[in-house]
């Protein structure tokens, strides 16, 4: 079978890095590339609509005003899954521009398909490692906010180093946020919620909007996700955190 653009995309979600003596440098990644296959429909949606809804990793900052055709705030969501809640938020907030990052191509294809169905134009998606996008493709101060909903909890203690929410990640995000930019996280793992709260609270550039100094109720503007519904079924709680850059 001929390899299409969508098929090739899965193989280029991160840039290979090497040591000075030419050996491949292993990275501690917050994601694992699952083997889920693109459906024919998802493949076609990616191939047909990438030019209008997709962005590729680049080593210089995106020109968001040119990409979106306006200067509306940019809200970045990392790990949007199948993309339904992201598209719903973009549809409900035409005064904001949304940028979604997801490394799993079936999710990217599904997100694009739903965006086309809803007629959403204020959304772009990227299929690449988020840490590289933050490092290379987004200018300092360019973002209005970051959304991180139900990231992989890596629940085993020996895997906690793989969790995306680490001090260096938060520092990197803050650098990309403009003044009063927000960080909104949600998880259905209490241990991860505690880690998120600890890491975010330790950064003096952020202010917690919770009146109690911890978590907030799910705001109406965040759609109920399938991961959240799954958590409720398993008897898990759900914790939202909302911090603002000083």
UniProtKB/Swiss-Prot annotation:
Disulfide bonds listed in the record: none
PANTHER family with a match to the protein in the record: 3-DEOXY-D-MANNO-OCTULOSONIC-ACID TRANSFERASE/TRNA GUANINE-N 7 - -METHYLTRANSFERASE (PTHR23417), PENTACOTRIPEPTIDE-REPEAT REGION OF PRORP DOMAIN-CONTAINING PROTEIN (PTHR23417:SF14)
Lineage: Bacteria, Pseudomonadati, Pseudomonadota, Gammaproteobacteria, Pasteurellales
Biological source species: Haemophilus influenzae (strain 86-028NP)
Pathway: tRNA modification; N(7)-methylguanine-tRNA biosynthesis
Keywords on record: Methyltransferase, S-adenosyl-L-methionine, Transferase, tRNA processing
Residues that, per the record, bind S-adenosyl-L-methionine: 77, 102, 129, 152
Role, per record: Catalyzes the formation of N(7)-methylguanine at position 46 (m7G46) in tRNA.
Family from the record: Belongs to the class I-like SAM-binding methyltransferase superfamily. TrmB family.
EC number of this enzyme: 2.1.1.33
Entry superkingdom: Bacteria
GO molecular function: tRNA (guanine(46)-N7)-methyltransferase activity
GO cellular component, one term: tRNA methyltransferase complex
NCBIfam families to which the protein is assigned, alphabetical: tRNA (guanosine(46)-N7)-methyltransferase TrmB
SUPFAM superfamilies, per database record: S-adenosyl-L-methionine-dependent methyltransferases
Protein name: tRNA (guanine-N(7)-)-methyltransferase
Active site: 152
Residues the entry annotates as binding substrate: 156, 188, 225-228
